[in-house]
Amino acid sequence: YIGAAAKHTPEAFFHGNIDEVRVWDIALTVDQLRYVMNQEIEENSTFVAGSYLISKSVTPTKNDISSVPWSKLAGYYPMSIYTYTNTKDQSGNGHQGALRNLRTVDRQTAPLPYQSTQDGDWDNSNTWINGDVQTIPGTTSIVDNSLSINWNLVRTTHNVTIDDDSDLPSANGGNRSVLGLFVDSNEITI
């Protein structure tokens, strides 16, 4: 079971949303997992690639997933194609996923990528689409406050101001990093 604990009968259900599930035949490194965390994936010349970066025709210098063969992906369920109570395996391996105890399909709130929704301060949740349910991009980890989350993809179309670094670990020296920053229109002011 995914989203519940059980051997035979599910219990202790996960209270939240699951945007997609990936099953690998290889142990990925922490950096590889982070690289694809905020983007869907696709096959690119028999290797795994981040869909958002491909759509932008960007090949970042920090491409931690580029050496992982697509064939090592046993199952990929982006939860975007449903047939009754099943979800399609986008890995190409034909491992259809069965959805159980699902009462509703919610809108996608995963930051793929994070996107601005209005002019405002970077650290204000109202500046971001789904900012009320997602943490601010490029800020401190909610698990380890000595770690800055620097693997987010961010797309802005508004005037965004960064003038407060108080939520960053002191080791950052006031610097904020993200995996990819796309300023499609307007400006980011620091």
Please provide the spans of the model-predicted regions.
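Polyanion-binding and phosphate-handling cores
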Residues: 7-8, 14, 29-37, 64, ...
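Extracytoplasmic low-complexity segments
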Residues: 37-115
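Core-facing hydrophobic residues within beta-strands of well-ordered domains
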Residues: 18, 73-74, 178
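Extracellular beta-sheet-rich ligand-binding/adhesion modules
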Residues: 85, 109-190
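Short hydrophobic/aromatic patches on beta-strands that form ligand-binding or substrate-lining surfaces
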Residues: 2, 18-24, 77-78
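Extracellular glycan-interaction patches encoded by glycine-rich segments
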Residues: 1-18, 56-68
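Acidic, glycine-rich loop-and-strand cores that form catalytic or ligand-binding grooves
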Residues: 20-32, 36-46
